[in-house]
Amino acid sequence: MSKIVKVIGREIIDSRGNPTVEAEVHLEGGFVGMAAAPSGASTGSREALELRDGDKSRFLGKGVLKALEAVNGPIAQALLGKDAKDQATVDQIMIDLDGTENKSKFGANAILAVSLANAKAAAAAKGMPLYAHIAELNGTPGVYSMPLPMMNIINGGEHADNNVDIQEFMIQPVGAKTLKEAVRMGAEVFHNLAKVLKSKGYNTAVGDEGGFAPNLKSNAEALEVIAEAVAAAGYKLGTDITLAMDCAASEFYDAEKKEYNLKGEGRVFTSNGFSDFLADLTTKFPIVSIEDGLDESDWDGFAYQTAELGKKIQIVGDDLFVTNTKILKRGIDNGIANSILIKFNQIGSLTETLAAIKMAKDAGYTAVISHRSGETEDATIADLAVGTAAGQIKTGSMSRSDRVAKYNQLIRIEEALGAKAPFRGLKEVKNQA
């Protein structure tokens, strides 16, 4: 009943109005799985390749017809008759057929969409929710947890058209007892932040991930207005709500000069100087997690940053590790960072994603499941977070349906699992247990 009988790909639209790949996998017995590939804006140079057509007369060159040719042609042919429940084999067939290191022949967007659709079809054939199937694929059947959200309520960098250099300023509702309560707390802070920004004459338009995108006097002011919003919502900063940042520092790094240029506030830093700047912020605000605090190639700088902050807070590698076990192993071996951001499409298949999560956990690193800035209504990452008991999730702010879809799926899963999926809050964050 779990043999693949048909694979279909189509071009749909993501949250930025760009095309992306959606795939359907059909099994014997009428079971169907459907999934869509997300797309990043600030991307690591070592990510698996997202295949775009380059035809400027169509979607400004961002069409995905070439990727769809792979889905509807060689991938579909190769997977006919295969057992969808054997996810590792399905993924390996596509990887081998592509034959490149970075999936550049078919595109990671093509392979990933089919990989996730296959998992959904297999879950349907087994008569179980996707998170339960993922837990079985992960070798941890029945082991679940609800993730602590990192909610990106001020957007900057590549995610917004403003003067804020640091890409994401996030809140974590650590005082919540359940995921549903955490979502409520986040929503209340989000609405109070709108009031705080309006009172200061700031814009309340939102960026790619649903957070506000005002022009501010400095990056530190973003933390200050969030602190005001937390208080206005009736919560205590550092107890009920903690803070996290994604610097996406590769986006403001000058490789020739080896400098970090915060143009929005007219400040330039050396590598160690920028780490010291971040360390100073952690003394002024309850920041418990910093992601991509340096350029992806600045491994010496990351060694310094990890030595300075790695015993105190969570140091997350996103562009640094790109969900790639080879690169993550180098980081583990050299004591670089202490956490990895997990993005399906950086590596391009569910099997490889699960391998990265396992490697991180085995080494004592945390794994933070993440969306991309270009998303769809597909909420698979919610099931991934619960099914791997990863403990943390980044899926944007409290606006835009492409973000809220993931929170709503988490609420449904928590309702279904109850006490079987504990919400551990701050204990999930490295160095905060």
UniProtKB/Swiss-Prot annotation:
Single GO cellular component term: phosphopyruvate hydratase complex
Cofactor note: Binds a second Mg(2+) ion via substrate during catalysis.
Keywords: Cytoplasm, Glycolysis, Lyase, Magnesium, Metal-binding, Secreted
Its biological purpose: Catalyzes the reversible conversion of 2-phosphoglycerate (2-PG) into phosphoenolpyruvate (PEP). It is essential for the degradation of carbohydrates via glycolysis.
Keyword field contains Lipoprotein: no
Pathway: Carbohydrate degradation; glycolysis; pyruvate from D-glyceraldehyde 3-phosphate: step 4/5
Species per Swiss-Prot/TrEMBL record: Aeromonas hydrophila subsp. hydrophila (strain ATCC 7966 / DSM 30187 / BCRC 13018 / CCUG 14551 / JCM 1027 / KCTC 2358 / NCIMB 9240 / NCTC 8049)
Protein name, entry field: Enolase
Predominant location: cytoplasm
Residues binding Mg(2+): D246, E291, D318
PROSITE patterns cross-referenced by the UniProt entry: ENOLASE (PS00164)
Record InterPro entries: Enolase, Enolase-like_C_sf, Enolase-like_N, Enolase_C, Enolase_CS, Enolase_N
Self-association and partners: Component of the RNA degradosome, a multiprotein complex involved in RNA processing and mRNA degradation.
GO biological process terms on file: glycolytic process
Binding site for (2R)-2-phosphoglycerate: Q167, K343, R372, S373, K394
Localisation: Cytoplasm; Secreted; Cell surface
GO molecular function terms attached to this record: magnesium ion binding; phosphopyruvate hydratase activity
Residues at the active site: E209, K343
Documented EC number(s): 4.2.1.11
Similarity-based family: Belongs to the enolase family.
Gene name as annotated: eno
Swiss-Prot/TrEMBL catalytic activity: (2R)-2-phosphoglycerate = phosphoenolpyruvate + H2O
Pfam families (alphabetical): Enolase_C, Enolase_N
Cofactor: Mg(2+)
